[in-house]
Amino acid sequence: MPLRTRASALAAVIAVAALAASPAVAQQSVADFYKGKTVTLLLGTGPGGSYDLYARIFAEHLPRHIPGNPTIVIEHMPGAGGVIAGNHLYGPGPQDGTKVLLSHAIINAEVLNPKAGVRFQSAKFNWIGTYDAIAHTIAFWHAAPVKTIADLKKGNVIVGSFAKAHFTYQWPAMMRDALGLDFKLITGYPTGSTNNLAMERGEIHGWAASWENLIGTRPQWIAEKKVTLLMQFLLERKRQLPDVPTLLEMAPANKKDVVEFMSASTPFGRGIVTGPGVPAERVAALRKAFEATVKDPAFLETAKQRKVDVEWRDHQHTMSLVKKIVGASPDLIARVKKSIGQEE
């Protein structure tokens, strides 16, 4: 074999060997990075609600699936319906894979209320996946003057919420608009726990509670029928709530696309993302760890014991939904804003 040919062949062998070894090298690099590190699960809510429930389960099970087995801690950064936490992760937060956001539907804030201090672009986050679709319901205390949808037309009912940029405000507002209802919708209750306490005390009659919040933190309320669930806000009825209609079912024809837009965003209320600057090999490792965790029998058993659901989507499916929402027409966005009381 001529010298040049032998040299070319040797170079090709070296290149193939390097390619074959690169995943192992990258994996070792990721393991070296995470070994002895602390990874923070960032939440845009205070302690005590459904996000806190999920975060504690992930903190317990996710570390063993991340190379290097880092410690996981939980950080609460409530405010503006998750926007403050989203801004932090996108900008000043570390871009090395040591901080991960358990997101609200921050994509809605970007599309529907970009002037409310939004400094991130959802499509530039590294989406790890979604672990469920947040199942908001409209729940009323058993002593409240509300037993049917018709009772919400009388103008004497008070519904509480986190903030105008949050689902807890937007869903009741859209329900009121789509069905021609008349009730007072107020803000100022920043967590699920504060809304539940206000409802129990009679300060408010009800709120758009997530099913996970109720069944996870107040299971006795469900068992003892302390709350009345009138409606749920999903594309399809949740299997645990077969007799509770969705707003999409009840919406008139001229509101269907508006309600469907909001309903399609519910998976992002249970998303996991990293900042846009995290190295690709660490993003890949976190995605692999996420999928291993949500398939892990021990994780699923803990979720079952704590009465939270897991219906996960991988990063590719999640990203396809992101693109669909950020690509919605200006006309549809304007009508959605009007329906949720956030028109400019």
Where are these regions (language model features)?
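Bacterial N-terminal signal peptides
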Residues: 11-20
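Surface-exposed loop and edge beta-strand positions of immunoglobulin-like domains
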Residues: 75, 275-276
